[in-house]
Amino acid sequence: MKLGIKLINDVSGLKFDNQSIKIIKKYNIPFVIHHIQGKPSTMQKNPKYENVLLDIYDYFVERIKYVRFSGVKHNNIIIDPGIGFGKNLKHNITLISKISLFHSLGFPVLIGISRKRFIKDISRKNDSKERLGGTIGSSLFAIMQGVQILRVHNVNEVIQSIKIFKELLKK
Protein backbone atom coordinates (compact mmCIF):
# COMPACT_ATOMS: atom_id res chain seq x y z
CA MET A 1 0.00 0.00 0.00
CA LYS A 2 3.01 2.24 0.44
CA LEU A 3 3.39 2.07 -3.34
CA GLY A 4 0.06 3.82 -3.88
CA ILE A 5 -2.08 0.81 -4.74
CA LYS A 6 -5.66 1.95 -5.29
CA LEU A 7 -7.34 -1.33 -6.25
CA ILE A 8 -6.69 -5.07 -5.99
CA ASN A 9 -7.70 -7.30 -8.89
CA ASP A 10 -7.65 -10.88 -7.62
CA VAL A 11 -8.19 -13.26 -10.55
CA SER A 12 -9.02 -16.08 -8.13
CA GLY A 13 -11.97 -14.37 -6.49
CA LEU A 14 -10.01 -14.60 -3.22
CA LYS A 15 -9.72 -18.39 -3.45
CA PHE A 16 -5.99 -18.87 -4.09
CA ASP A 17 -4.61 -16.73 -1.25
CA ASN A 18 -6.39 -16.44 2.08
CA GLN A 19 -4.23 -13.46 3.08
CA SER A 20 -5.71 -11.16 0.41
CA ILE A 21 -8.95 -10.66 2.32
CA LYS A 22 -7.00 -9.45 5.36
CA ILE A 23 -5.16 -6.84 3.28
CA ILE A 24 -8.38 -5.65 1.64
CA LYS A 25 -10.04 -5.23 5.03
CA LYS A 26 -7.00 -3.64 6.68
CA TYR A 27 -6.49 -0.98 4.01
CA ASN A 28 -10.16 -0.55 3.10
CA ILE A 29 -9.50 -0.51 -0.64
CA PRO A 30 -11.66 -1.59 -3.57
CA PHE A 31 -11.06 -4.96 -5.10
CA VAL A 32 -12.31 -7.00 -8.02
CA ILE A 33 -13.96 -10.36 -7.52
CA HIS A 34 -12.86 -12.00 -10.74
CA HIS A 35 -14.35 -15.24 -12.06
CA ILE A 36 -12.06 -18.02 -13.21
CA GLN A 37 -12.87 -21.66 -13.86
CA GLY A 38 -10.01 -23.75 -12.52
CA LYS A 39 -6.52 -22.34 -12.18
CA PRO A 40 -4.49 -20.38 -14.74
CA SER A 41 -2.60 -23.55 -15.70
CA THR A 42 -5.79 -25.54 -16.37
CA MET A 43 -8.51 -22.98 -17.06
CA GLN A 44 -8.59 -23.40 -20.85
CA LYS A 45 -8.64 -27.21 -20.84
CA ASN A 46 -12.18 -27.86 -22.08
CA PRO A 47 -14.12 -25.33 -19.98
CA LYS A 48 -17.72 -26.41 -19.34
CA TYR A 49 -20.76 -24.79 -17.78
CA GLU A 50 -24.37 -25.88 -17.40
CA ASN A 51 -25.33 -22.28 -18.11
CA VAL A 52 -22.40 -19.87 -18.27
CA LEU A 53 -24.47 -16.85 -17.20
CA LEU A 54 -26.20 -18.49 -14.26
CA ASP A 55 -23.14 -20.46 -13.14
CA ILE A 56 -21.06 -17.27 -12.94
CA TYR A 57 -23.94 -15.36 -11.37
CA ASP A 58 -24.17 -18.02 -8.64
CA TYR A 59 -20.38 -17.86 -8.19
CA PHE A 60 -20.64 -14.11 -7.56
CA VAL A 61 -23.49 -14.59 -5.08
CA GLU A 62 -21.33 -17.05 -3.12
CA ARG A 63 -18.17 -14.91 -3.27
CA ILE A 64 -20.06 -11.73 -2.32
CA LYS A 65 -21.56 -13.47 0.72
CA TYR A 66 -18.08 -14.63 1.72
CA VAL A 67 -16.42 -11.21 1.46
CA ARG A 68 -19.32 -9.37 3.09
CA PHE A 69 -19.35 -11.90 5.96
CA SER A 70 -15.58 -11.37 6.24
CA GLY A 71 -16.19 -7.67 6.86
CA VAL A 72 -15.47 -6.12 3.46
CA LYS A 73 -17.55 -3.02 2.79
CA HIS A 74 -20.16 -3.16 0.05
CA ASN A 75 -18.73 -0.13 -1.77
CA ASN A 76 -15.30 -1.80 -2.07
CA ILE A 77 -16.57 -4.66 -4.24
CA ILE A 78 -16.36 -4.78 -8.05
CA ILE A 79 -17.23 -7.86 -10.11
CA ASP A 80 -15.56 -9.15 -13.28
CA PRO A 81 -16.93 -12.20 -15.16
CA GLY A 82 -13.40 -13.02 -16.33
CA ILE A 83 -13.60 -13.01 -20.12
CA GLY A 84 -11.11 -15.60 -21.36
CA PHE A 85 -10.48 -17.13 -17.93
CA GLY A 86 -11.81 -20.66 -18.28
CA LYS A 87 -14.17 -19.84 -21.11
CA ASN A 88 -14.39 -20.73 -24.79
CA LEU A 89 -15.56 -18.45 -27.61
CA LYS A 90 -19.25 -19.26 -27.09
CA HIS A 91 -18.99 -18.61 -23.34
CA ASN A 92 -17.26 -15.27 -23.89
CA ILE A 93 -19.77 -14.09 -26.49
CA THR A 94 -22.68 -15.10 -24.25
CA LEU A 95 -21.18 -13.27 -21.26
CA ILE A 96 -20.46 -10.08 -23.18
CA SER A 97 -23.84 -10.02 -24.91
CA LYS A 98 -25.76 -10.60 -21.67
CA ILE A 99 -23.45 -8.90 -19.16
CA SER A 100 -26.22 -6.60 -17.97
CA LEU A 101 -27.55 -9.54 -15.91
CA PHE A 102 -24.76 -8.96 -13.38
CA HIS A 103 -25.99 -5.44 -12.55
CA SER A 104 -28.75 -7.03 -10.49
CA LEU A 105 -26.08 -8.02 -7.94
CA GLY A 106 -25.71 -4.35 -7.04
CA PHE A 107 -22.00 -3.86 -7.70
CA PRO A 108 -19.99 -2.13 -10.42
CA VAL A 109 -19.14 -4.44 -13.31
CA LEU A 110 -15.62 -4.49 -14.76
CA ILE A 111 -14.78 -6.26 -17.98
CA GLY A 112 -11.38 -6.94 -19.49
CA ILE A 113 -11.82 -7.46 -23.22
CA SER A 114 -8.81 -5.71 -24.67
CA ARG A 115 -6.95 -7.79 -27.26
CA LYS A 116 -8.56 -11.00 -25.97
CA ARG A 117 -8.48 -14.32 -27.74
CA PHE A 118 -12.18 -14.16 -28.62
CA ILE A 119 -11.33 -11.15 -30.82
CA LYS A 120 -8.62 -13.23 -32.48
CA ASP A 121 -11.02 -16.14 -32.98
CA ILE A 122 -13.59 -13.91 -34.68
CA SER A 123 -11.28 -11.54 -36.60
CA ARG A 124 -8.46 -14.02 -37.36
CA LYS A 125 -5.90 -11.44 -36.20
CA ASN A 126 -3.14 -13.44 -34.53
CA ASP A 127 -1.08 -10.44 -33.45
CA SER A 128 -2.69 -9.00 -30.33
CA LYS A 129 -1.69 -5.48 -31.41
CA GLU A 130 -3.97 -5.87 -34.45
CA ARG A 131 -7.09 -6.32 -32.31
CA LEU A 132 -7.83 -2.67 -31.52
CA GLY A 133 -10.95 -2.62 -33.69
CA GLY A 134 -12.35 -5.65 -31.87
CA THR A 135 -11.43 -4.12 -28.53
CA ILE A 136 -13.22 -0.87 -29.38
CA GLY A 137 -16.30 -2.63 -30.76
CA SER A 138 -16.54 -4.88 -27.70
CA SER A 139 -15.95 -1.95 -25.36
CA LEU A 140 -18.75 0.08 -26.92
CA PHE A 141 -21.09 -2.89 -26.69
CA ALA A 142 -20.15 -3.33 -23.01
CA ILE A 143 -20.86 0.35 -22.37
CA MET A 144 -24.30 -0.12 -23.98
CA GLN A 145 -24.87 -2.96 -21.50
CA GLY A 146 -24.07 -0.63 -18.59
CA VAL A 147 -20.56 -1.83 -17.78
CA GLN A 148 -18.94 0.79 -15.57
CA ILE A 149 -15.25 -0.18 -15.81
CA LEU A 150 -13.23 -1.30 -18.84
CA ARG A 151 -9.75 -2.77 -18.58
CA VAL A 152 -7.95 -1.92 -21.83
CA HIS A 153 -4.48 -1.45 -23.31
CA ASN A 154 -5.13 1.38 -25.78
CA VAL A 155 -6.63 3.81 -23.28
CA ASN A 156 -6.66 6.96 -25.45
CA GLU A 157 -8.25 5.22 -28.43
CA VAL A 158 -10.96 3.60 -26.32
CA ILE A 159 -11.72 6.87 -24.50
CA GLN A 160 -12.00 8.68 -27.84
CA SER A 161 -14.34 6.03 -29.24
CA ILE A 162 -16.55 6.20 -26.13
CA LYS A 163 -16.74 10.01 -26.31
CA ILE A 164 -17.79 9.88 -29.97
CA PHE A 165 -20.23 7.06 -29.31
CA LYS A 166 -21.90 8.88 -26.41
CA GLU A 167 -22.13 12.11 -28.40
CA LEU A 168 -23.78 10.29 -31.30
CA LEU A 169 -26.29 8.68 -28.95
CA LYS A 170 -27.43 12.13 -27.80
CA LYS A 171 -28.72 13.01 -31.29
Residue ranges, per PLM feature:
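Active-site metal-binding loops of divalent metal-dependent hydrolases
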Residues: 83
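Active-site-adjacent loop and "lid" segments of alpha/beta metabolic enzymes
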Residues: 1-66, 86-171
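Short acidic capping loops at alpha-helix termini that bridge into adjacent secondary structure
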Residues: 73-76
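Conserved C-terminal portion of the radical SAM core fold
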Residues: 68-70
